Amino acid sequence: MKKLLSLIIIGGALVAGCNSQTTQEKTSAIVKQNGVQEIVKPTLLTKQMFLDQIMDYETNPSEWIYKGDMPSLIDFYADWCRPCRITSPILEELAQEYAGKIKVYKVDVQAEQELAAVFGIQSIPSFLYIPKDDTPVMSSGIAQTPEATKDMFRKQIDEILLNKTN
C-alpha cells in the first residue's frame, strides 16, 4: 500500500512538473521599462472599450477619428478557429517586442458581433492595423508556418504602423 501511495505521489509531482508555467506566464509578457517590470499582453476589447479607446463609430459613422495614443493592431478572432489559436501566442510575443511602440488588441467575433459587422469581418483571423495619423489597413489570414506568420506581422507592423521601410 505504501508503494502504491508513493507511486501516486511521484506521478502527480511529475505531471505537475511538466506543466510548471503558470497561466500568467503563458499568456503574458513581462517588459522591464525604467527599472519597473510591466506585464504586456493583448487587451480584449468589448464594444464599449472600442468606442471609448479606439473609435466612436456611433458618433462619427462616416469619418475615422482614432482616439488612441499610439498605433494599434486589432486581432479579430474566435476561440474555435485553428489559425486564430496559432496567431494568439505570436501576437503575445509581438506585444512584448513592440511594447511602448504599438498596442495589441483582440476582439472575439462571437462575443462582439456588432464590431465584427462594422468592419465587415467575413473570415478570421482578420487584423486591423491602425497607424497613429493615417488610414487603417485591414488584412486577413496567416502564413504557412508560425515563423512565417511572425515575420509577416513584423513586416506589416514596421511598414504600416511604424512607417519603417527596409
Residue positions per predicted region:
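Non-catalytic, surface beta->alpha helical segment in thiol-disulfide oxidoreductase systems
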Residues: 123, 128-166
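N-terminal targeting signals for export/organelle localization
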Residues: 1-51, 158-166
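Thiol-based oxidoreductase modules, predominantly thioredoxin-like and allied folds used
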Residues: 76-78, 87-95, 99-114, 121
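A short beta-strand-turn-helix
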Residues: 45-70
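C-type cytochrome heme c attachment motif
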Residues: 79-86, 126
